[in-house]
């Protein structure tokens, strides 16, 4: 598990190396209502055409997971007591085993 804050270049490089990984898009300050799960290759969170800081700057962080096994711990760390994301991306439709 790796977290990116104010490092879009590092984050985008991680998504290229781990296209089958998972990304939790979260607010800068933990908010259990905003823990969005994406696949690492989701174009809504890995398009290099966005302005610098669009992904890991401003109000957001990215928590990157190379395997599904890490997901529950990461979600709990963000305040999700059941260890699940608050939402799954409607574009990449990440599937996880229950």
Predicted regions and their residues:
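Mature, structured domains enriched in cysteine- and short glycine motifs
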Residues: 1-98
């Amino acid at each position: 598990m790796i977290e990116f804050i104010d490092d879009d270049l590092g984050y985008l490089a991680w998504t290229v190396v781990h296209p089958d990984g998972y990304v939790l898009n979260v607010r800068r300050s933990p908010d259990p209502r905003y823990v969005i799960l994406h696949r690492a290759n989701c174009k809504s969170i890995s398009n290099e055409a966005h302005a610098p800081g669009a992904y890991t700057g401003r109000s957001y962080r990215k928590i990157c997971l190379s395997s599904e096994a890490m997901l529950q711990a990461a979600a709990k760390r963000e305040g999700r007591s059941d260890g699940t994301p608050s939402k799954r991306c409607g574009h990449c439709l990440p599937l996880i085993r229950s």
